[in-house]
């Protein structure tokens, strides 16, 4: 059998094996893994001599591992495995071993197997596990602490590391009873073998220092693992510390990494971070002399003399930073603990004073990884200081060096070359670090606002002063830093933003900001020859537009700078600058005055559109995609900001209306010609021509948006001036011509739909006669349900905006419009996306009907033109109320709301009332449409109970179903109010007998529930009791 297994493994792992044989071999091995007796043969295959091939032995051990882990071997089987493997280990790794040691992969697998046996047998069955492997380390029984057998030492250390990983690694998720098992094993080790294990570390450190760095490093890494769960007093003896201290301080004479030193620091970090009582922690920090150790490390040549050179040891810096971070974090915990005595608190306070300079040295390290390592502890310090009610001077004095260090770290380092493509990832990492540093600055400001204001304002003022004196000779990094910090300063200076949102805005900060902004605008910073500075300048001006609202005289100068900077010959710069120019103009359009002609002339060279079809994005569905990179699409999307900005600046109150129309015409005429020149090619399917027309349509719409976007939130939309409206009516006509020719293209329809929505405010009622053309073009035979839904949403705006003027147009277009919509509603569903789009179309259709009814346009639905379609509308709403019941609750709720509105519009005067003490119904129903009273009872009422009795309708467990239930209750009551006794008679003759109730409680609840939810709860209980 063993030969068969060996052969199968070799075939399975031989790349040259016949595929059919290989498949059979894998199948055989799969069966072998499930065989409860296979482990016995496999253990022999591993230990036998002469040895089998490495792959055979590796797979054999895997099968043994599986048996120990999963198959729950009995005590005799485990004992056999223990004896056979221990015998093998002694032969291979013990003193005087003749056999060659296993290759590393087999040593790892053997260590894993032995660890699994440890977990099963250490408590009972192999109590001498650790001492058995420790015995392998000594060549002479007479001198057992002379650990001179390197093979045995290496395996012993592997075993210790593996045992920790199995029972004490907190990063691994534990299942079932593993946690309990691991706790018991750790307790057993502490009781039996812990002192022996620690002594073995001491022996190894003592005997291998200066002889074998690999063993030293391995020993230290094992110590670092075990320290977290053993009695720390066993480790921090003077003898052990005397061995550790020289290793921590050892220096590689060539500079660069020293693995032993780094491992020693890691072990020390774990010792320092050991969880213990606050009093003990302060004593431990003192006992370990951590301040002196870290100070010496920081002052050592790798971190001091070699700083700023290629010999600087960043790995050592990061290791020391981890140690400092652990120590400071624990010190802060002691200070935050209210139960700590004064003596311990004083010691902790002194520790904080001692370690802060070391922390700030590492925080300021040129390597951002080192800086990031200590950010958590610096955050802890600032969080603690925020909680101190009356900040002592000793603590307040810490803030200035902290703030200075943060500001210094905010600066681009000397190797940075902003905007160079190969450094994009490095720049992104730094900008992410800046965000973390900003949070630290905010914490400083929260502790001492005046300090924050002084540092920030002095930094900016000094930089601007240096700029005046040195001009272009200044380092761009210094100016960039000042401008970046100025952007952060606004969180204090401006109200309702950032820190100021929690309290009143800082008048001191606001005053400083005003002074700084004056200096900034008056300086020559906009002429500095570096894109980082120029773009930051634009960002600052846009960020503080509120400054220009009260300092109008500075606007022309800044606007002139912006117009110049939007021409900057760097794509990434341009893309951002066009957006910032748009923001600046938009926010200050009431103050810029009549400058449109000058600006249009100045940026005219940026307006020509050059559509580019990229090889990978040439399909029609991708033409409208919004990119965030420097692709042609992304550049065009930014170019649109220029058109919108022209719209804003051309339609200011200071610009005469005839001039507004002239400016609009001057920008649109080239676009019209461009569209006309490309239309024929586009009709023949030319991708570039189609994309060009798409872009022109988008530009026309965006320009219109700038002209029409004047209303502030909450203000009534004003009718546009006829001169301006006439110009944009020409744009609408041009777009409609293109749409009529190209409406089979989804991307063209999308651009036209976008333009239509933006033209509404500048066209005013002039859009109404064009509506049939828009509908014809935008709702083509190839329009998706999603497109129909979006267009209905636009029509909602039109109906609401022109409700007094739209009646005649709506009367003409309603039936053809809804026929298109019904076609979309009837389309079969193919996949999840289709189902989502159908749900959206249903919701928009029902909302559109409600908008018509809510704006007193219901007469259009029953006009002579549309009355033949009225029955179809009602049927569609009733159907959606039913089909939405459990598939689309939102549509169902809207459908019942629509039926409720229909009852209100055509149900006639009330003949009954709902009140706590209702009177009996009086008179007969007189609906607005003859016979509509019976129509409501026979068509609307049944759908209510059809949904209620649907087994999948469960309002007690689903919030959306509950909303539908409430709308059903409201509809039932509305029908009663309009039909009175007719409805009661219907209920008594049909519904109540069907439900098996006398109806008294039903009628009482329906007629007295002034809140529809009360009647809804009754209906819910009624149906629930019948299920």
Swiss-Prot record:
SUPFAM superfamilies: ARM repeat. tRNA nucleus export receptor which facilitates tRNA translocation across the nuclear pore complex. Involved in pre-tRNA splicing, probably by affecting the interaction of pre-tRNA with splicing endonuclease. Its main location: nucleus. One of its GO terms (biological process) is tRNA re-export from nucleus. Belongs to the exportin family. It is found in: Nucleus; Cytoplasm. One of its GO terms (cellular component) is nuclear pore. InterPro entries: ARM-like (IPR011989), ARM-type_fold (IPR016024), Exportin-1/Importin-b-like (IPR013598), Exportin-T_C (IPR045546), XPOT (IPR040017). GO terms for molecular function: small GTPase binding; tRNA binding. This is Exportin-T. It comes from the Eukaryota. The gene is LOS1. Keywords: Cytoplasm, Nucleus, RNA-binding, Transport, tRNA processing, tRNA-binding.
């Amino acid at each position: 059998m063993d030969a068969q297994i060996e052969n199968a493994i070799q075939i399975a792992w031989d790349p040259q094996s016949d595929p059919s044989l290989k498949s059979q071999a894998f199948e055989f091995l799969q069966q072998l893994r499930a065989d409860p007796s296979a482990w016995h043969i496999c253990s022999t295959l591993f230990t036998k001599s002469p040895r089998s091939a490495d792959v055979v032995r590796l797979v054999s051990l895997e099968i043994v591992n599986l048996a120990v882990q999963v198959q729950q071997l009995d005590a005799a089987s485990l004992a056999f495995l223990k004896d056979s493997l221990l015998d093998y280990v002694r032969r291979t790794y013990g003193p005087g071993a003749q056999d060659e040691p296993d290759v590393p992969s087999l040593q790892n697998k053997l260590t894993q197997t032995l660890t699994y046996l440890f977990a099963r047998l250490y408590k009972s069955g192999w109590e001498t596990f650790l001492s058995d492997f420790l015995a392998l380390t000594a060549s002479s029984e007479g001198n057992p602490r002379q650990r001179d057998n390197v093979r045995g030492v290496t395996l012993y250390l592997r075993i210790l590391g593996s045992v920790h990983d199995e029972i004490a690694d907190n990063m691994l998720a534990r299942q079932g009873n593993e946690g309990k098992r691991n706790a018991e094993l750790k307790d057993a080790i502490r009781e039996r073998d812990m002192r022996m294990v620690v002594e073995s570390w001491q022996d190894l450190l003592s005997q291998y220092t200066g002889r074998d760095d690999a063993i030293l490093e391995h020993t230290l890494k094992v110590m670092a693992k075990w320290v977290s769960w053993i009695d720390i007093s066993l480790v921090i003896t003077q003898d052990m510390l005397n061995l550790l201290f020289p290793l921590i301080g050892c220096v590689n004479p060539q500079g660069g990494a020293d693995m032993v030193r780094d491992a020693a620091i890691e072990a020390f970090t774990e010792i320092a971070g050991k969880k213990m009582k606050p009093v003990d922690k302060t004593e431990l920090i003192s006992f370990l002399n951590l301040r002196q150790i870290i100070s010496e490390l920081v002052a050592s040549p790798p971190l001091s003399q070699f700083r700023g050179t290629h010999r600087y040891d960043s790995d050592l810096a990061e290791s020391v930073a981890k140690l400092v971070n652990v120590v400071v974090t624990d010190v802060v915990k002691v200070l935050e603990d209210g139960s700590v005595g004064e003596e311990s608190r004083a010691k902790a306070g002194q520790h904080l004073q001692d370690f802060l300079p070391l922390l700030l040295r590492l925080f300021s390290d040129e390597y951002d990884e080192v800086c990031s390592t200590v950010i958590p502890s610096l955050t802890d310090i600032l969080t603690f200081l925020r909680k101190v009610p009356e900040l002592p001077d000793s603590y307040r004095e810490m803030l200035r060096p902290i703030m200075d260090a943060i500001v210094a770290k905010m600066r681009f380092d000397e190797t940075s070359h902003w905007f160079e493509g190969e450094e994009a990832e490095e720049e992104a990492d730094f900008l992410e670090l800046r965000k973390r540093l900003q949070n630290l600055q905010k914490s400083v400001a929260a502790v001492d606002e005046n300090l924050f204001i002084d540092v920030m304002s002095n930094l900016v003022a000094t930089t601007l002063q240096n700029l005046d004196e040195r001009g272009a000779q200044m380092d761009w990094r210094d100016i960039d830093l000042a401008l970046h910090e100025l952007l952060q300063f606004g969180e204090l200076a401006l109200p309702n933003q950032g820190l100021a949102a929690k309290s009143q805005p800082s008048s001191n900060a606001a005053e400083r900001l005003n002074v700084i902004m004056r200096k900034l605008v008056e300086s020559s910073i906009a002429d500095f020859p570096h894109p980082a500075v120029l773009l930051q300048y634009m960002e600052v001006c846009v960020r503080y537009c509120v400054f220009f609202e009260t300092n109008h005289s500075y606007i022309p100068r800044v606007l002139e700078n912006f117009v110049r900077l939007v021409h900057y010959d760097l794509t990434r710069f341009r893309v951002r600058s066009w957006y910032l120019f748009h923001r600046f103009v938009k926010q200050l359009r009431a103050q810029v005055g009549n400058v449109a002609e000058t600006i249009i002339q100045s940026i005219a060279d940026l307006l020509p559109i050059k559509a580019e079809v990229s090889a990978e994005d040439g399909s029609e569905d991708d033409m409208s995609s919004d990119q965030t990179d420097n692709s042609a699409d992304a550049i065009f999307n930014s170019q649109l900001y220029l058109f919108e900005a022209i719209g804003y600046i051309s339609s200011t109150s200071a610009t005469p209306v005839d001039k507004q129309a002239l400016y609009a015409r001057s920008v649109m005429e080239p676009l019209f010609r461009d569209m006309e020149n490309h239309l024929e090619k586009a009709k023949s399917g030319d991708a570039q021509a189609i994309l060009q027309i798409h872009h022109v349509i988008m530009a026309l719409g965006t320009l219109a948006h700038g002209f029409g976007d004047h209303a502030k939130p909450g203000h009534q939309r004003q009718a546009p001036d006829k001169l301006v409206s006439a110009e944009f009516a020409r744009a609408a006509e041009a777009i409609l011509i293109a749409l009529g020719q190209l409406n089979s293209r989804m991307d063209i329809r999308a651009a036209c739909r976008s333009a239509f929505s933006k033209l509404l405010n500048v066209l005013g009622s002039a859009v109404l006669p064009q509506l049939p053309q828009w509908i014809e073009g935008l709702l083509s035979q190839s329009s998706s349900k999603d497109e129909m839904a979006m267009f209905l949403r636009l029509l909602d705006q039109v109906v609401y905006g022109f409700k007094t003027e739209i009646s005649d147009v709506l009367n003409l277009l309603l039936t053809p419009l809804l026929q298109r919509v019904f076609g979309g509603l009837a389309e079969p569903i193919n996949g999840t996306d289709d189902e989502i789009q159908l749900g959206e179309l249903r919701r928009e259709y029902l909302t559109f009907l409600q908008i018509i009814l809510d704006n007193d346009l219901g007469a259009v639905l029953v006009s002579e033109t549309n009355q033949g379609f009225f029955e179809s509308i009602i049927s569609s709403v009733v159907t959606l109320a039913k089909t939405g019941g459990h598939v689309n609750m939102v549509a169902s709720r809207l459908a019942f709301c629509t039926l409720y509105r229909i009852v209100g519009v055509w149900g006639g005067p009330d003949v009954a009332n709902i009140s706590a003490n209702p009177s009996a119904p009086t008179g007969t129903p007189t609906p607005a449409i003859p016979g509509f009273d019976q129509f409501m009872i026979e068509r609307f009422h049944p759908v209510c109970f059809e949904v209620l009795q649907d087994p999948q309708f469960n309002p007690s467990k689903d919030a959306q179903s509950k909303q539908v239930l409430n709308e059903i209750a409201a509809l039932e009551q509305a029908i009663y109010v309009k039909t009175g006794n007719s409805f009661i008679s219907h209920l008594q003759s049909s519904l109540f007998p069907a439900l098996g109730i006398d109806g008294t409680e039903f009628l009482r609840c329906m007629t007295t529930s002034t809140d529809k939810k009360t009647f809804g709860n009754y209906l819910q209980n009624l149906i629930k009791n019948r299920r």
